Amino acid sequence: EMTPDIFACILQYPNASGNVEDYRTFVEKAHAANCKVAVAADILSLALLTPPGEWGADIVFGTTQRLGTPMFYGGPSAGYFATRDEYKRNIPGRIIGWSKDKYGKLCYRMALQTREQHIKREKATSNICTAQALLATMAGFYAVYHGPEGIRTIAERIHSIAAYLEKNINKLGYKQVNEQYFDTLRFALPDTVSAQQIRTIALSKEVNLRYFHNGDVGMSIDETTDVSAANILLSIFAIAAGKDWTKAEDIPVNSTISKALKRQSSYLTHEVFNKYHTETEMMRYIKRLDRKDISLAHSMISLGSCTMKLNAAAEMLPLSRPEFMCMHPLVPEDQAEGYRELINNLSEELKVITGFAGVSLQPNSGAAGEYTGLRVIRAYLENIGQGHRNKILIPASAHGTNPASAIQAGFTTVTCACDAQGNVDMDDLRAKAEENKDDLAALMITYPSTHGIFETEIVEICRIIHECGA
């Protein structure tokens, strides 16, 4: 029921169990009640399923991990966010549009910049700047290389393996409960089989499955699943049921998706997704783009403080090893001891480097780190009975993400002046801190500053803020 206090709905497509719902009627009711609809969608499934924009969704979002980014134990992947044209001035992140250079040549450049935090600062629509640009580039090149036909072939192959497993595991006495699905199956077990039996057999074959609280068992297929893996999965259920099974030599293309849910429209229609489908073409295309880029291979480049680093090729090389790439984030902890040791070691080293007692490795960008720090400060202040403190002092030289993050975390901002060299104006800092001392929560300062300067007065700056109770 759409009560008056509901302003939006979030739907999953497919849902967490893998079932694909037909939301058309629900979306009509939501819009009739003046509710917006946001959909978390598996981007690869949309090669086969009707896209949410065609059945009325206002926003579609998700991760592009499925477009060529390995699991990395739940590590980074780029998100995607799509919406209607009418909302373009409110969406987070960068928008790129067509323009012309001074010679009249068509070019790409940032568009609608007046909505972004480097101009709008505390009035920006988000604190996002360039988080996960590398992963977004990888996903883009994946789509360029495979093109619409290649993407569809991959999606059809995944769905066909799922359909094959549904058909043959059902024959063994199980019941697949997802009425419609893309790549994920959920099986109700017969009375003669327990989830623990299946778990024991699966682990003996080095397979992890999903075990639901009600006793159901689930699995998800992806582009790395081949006929051999499908046979292993089938054998697990057959052995548990004590029944014979036939090994597949090949799995034909098949679809169980209903006509109402099947995608009919085209996608990836831009010419760039339809030109570079061989290794040589792709390599030359990437190199042409590379020649247009300014990087550390050419000269000094301006970098934000959260990206003042250089990852050498030698450091990137280990990331191509399957031990790093292929670890699923939900594996049992005893199967991820190496990863956990890396995480723990890095956390301990960062504690020593920073001089702090605790570390979070969850933030995926500088902007996310800012937000995390501010939320920790807010929680601390509330815990000591100082929750009324809601002002953040920020130097005028700070990157726009700083005031934007402060607003996102529920604070208000007070700007502190800087001198001609970009240093904090100490007199103005003292005055602003004293003026707001009863409500001051924190100072947000970049070290080195956005100008690349280490504040020589940093110790005195911290003393002033602490004296004000912040």
Predicted features by range, described:
Residues V227-S302, C306-A314, L319-M325:
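Flexible inter-domain linker/hinge segments
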Residues T278, E323-N364, G369:
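Conserved N-terminal alpha-helix of the aminotransferase class I/II PLP-enzyme fold
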Residues V177-T184, Y211-G218, N364, A406:
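Short Gly/Ser/Thr- and Asp/Glu-enriched loop/turn motifs at secondary-structure junctions
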Residues L67-N168, L172, V177-E179:
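Active-site C-terminal subdomain of aminotransferase-like
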Residues T69-A82, E86-Y87, A131-L135, S220, ...:
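Conserved phosphate/anionic-ligand binding catalytic regions in large, soluble enzymes, centered on
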Residues E1-C107, I169, G173, F182, ...:
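Conserved PLP-enzyme active-site core in the AAT-like
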Residues H159, L172-I201, I221-T224:
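Conserved PLP-binding catalytic core of the aspartate aminotransferase-like
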Residues P4-I10, H118-K120, V144-G150, V177-Y181, ...:
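Gly-rich Lys/Arg/Thr-decorated short loops/hinges at beta-loop-alpha junctions or inter-strand turns
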